């Protein structure tokens, strides 16, 4: 089943990005976003250190049946990276809530990956954002999260931000490579690293890590049992960043949540198993948009 996706080799997946053509000015930040297609609304949320580019091939495919919204969190991708602006999960959850209002979306489908999961959950549980369904893909939602590298950066963010560009690039590529189980092509690595390679991007990369804090998931974890919208938990079996046992625990905590584990995929499931993920999401979104 091709679900209108580019069903070619993995090497050709994610080699070209998309320029987000719209901007929302929000609390001094410029938030890049765009909309593709027509139909039931689907909002796709990225994580760290990623951007909406990770979701672009899926958005392009789903646009045949859905209105797909892509956006970059401030501090990421094509959105502003002002050093004076906080980029923590608390701010991003407030922004997502306001974005849904700006788009006049009463209850869209939401698909979230990594940090995007915590952002979507905070918007729903703390700020009243309503969803028709919520798909959580290898998400940050349960403590503990954050690696020893995160803690090292948090304690020395200024030092890391001042590294020579070549040293930063090497560290960045090594860090990102660990998120893929099958390995990244040079073109895929370029899509992921490019936003962080400028002088502004280098500072922004370490700033967002320094502002990572488990309290943002602690504040909502006890509320997962109150979630009433349909939830799908999808995980790469070989996720080295957030182990699959977190998926099992998260699915247990959310009433009625479904769990799907995809073999041969790591944290970057969009790269490692793009067709399998596309089929899973297409089935999920279609079933909840056109219930029998």
Where are these regions (language model features)?
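Conserved alpha/beta-hydrolase catalytic His-Asp/Glu region
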Residues: 144-147, 165-226
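Acidic catalytic loop of the alpha/beta-hydrolase fold
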Residues: 238-242
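Active-site loop/oxyanion-hole signature of alpha/beta-hydrolase fold enzymes
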Residues: 27, 36, 69-112, 279
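Catalytic active-site module of serine/aspartate enzymes centered on a nucleophile-bearing elbow/loop
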Residues: 257-292
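Short beta-strand/loop motif that positions the catalytic acidic residue
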Residues: 227, 233-235
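Flexible "cap/lid" loop of the alpha/beta hydrolase fold
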Residues: 125, 131-163
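Alpha/beta-hydrolase fold catalytic core
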Residues: 1-42, 63-66, 105-106, 279-292
């Amino acid at each position: 089943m091709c679900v209108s996706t580019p069903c070619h080799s993995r090497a050709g997946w994610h080699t070209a990005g998309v320029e987000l053509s719209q901007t929302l000015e929000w609390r001094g930040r410029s938030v890049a976003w765009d909309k593709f297609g027509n139909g039931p609304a689907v909002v796709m949320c990225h994580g760290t250190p990623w951007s909406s580019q990770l979701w672009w091939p899926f958005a392009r495919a789903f646009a045949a049946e859905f209105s797909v919204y892509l956006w970059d969190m401030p501090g990421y991708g094509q959105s502003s990276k002002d050093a004076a602006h906080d980029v923590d999960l608390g701010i991003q959850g407030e922004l997502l809530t306001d974005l849904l209002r700006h788009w006049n979306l009463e209850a869209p489908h939401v698909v979230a990956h990594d940090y995007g999961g915590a952002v979507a959950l905070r918007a729903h549980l703390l700020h009243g954002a309503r969803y028709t369904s919520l798909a959580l893909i290898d998400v940050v939602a349960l403590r503990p999260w954050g690696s020893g590298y995160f803690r090292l950066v948090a304690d020395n963010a200024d030092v890391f931000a001042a590294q020579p560009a070549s040293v930063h690039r090497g560290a960045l590529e090594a860090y990102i490579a660990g998120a893929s189980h099958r390995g990244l092509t040079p073109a895929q690595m370029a899509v992921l690293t490019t936003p962080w390679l400028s002088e502004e991007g280098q500072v922004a990369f370490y700033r967002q890590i320094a502002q990572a804090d488990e309290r943002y998931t602690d504040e909502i974890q006890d509320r997962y049992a109150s979630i009433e919208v349909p939830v799908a938990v999808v995980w790469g079996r070989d996720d080295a960043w957030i182990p699959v046992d977190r998926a099992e625990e998260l699915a247990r905590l959310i009433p009625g949540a479904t769990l799907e584990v995809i073999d041969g995929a790591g944290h970057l499931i969009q790269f490692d198993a793009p067709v399998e993920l596309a089929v899973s999401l297409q089935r999920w979104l279609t079933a909840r948009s056109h219930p029998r």
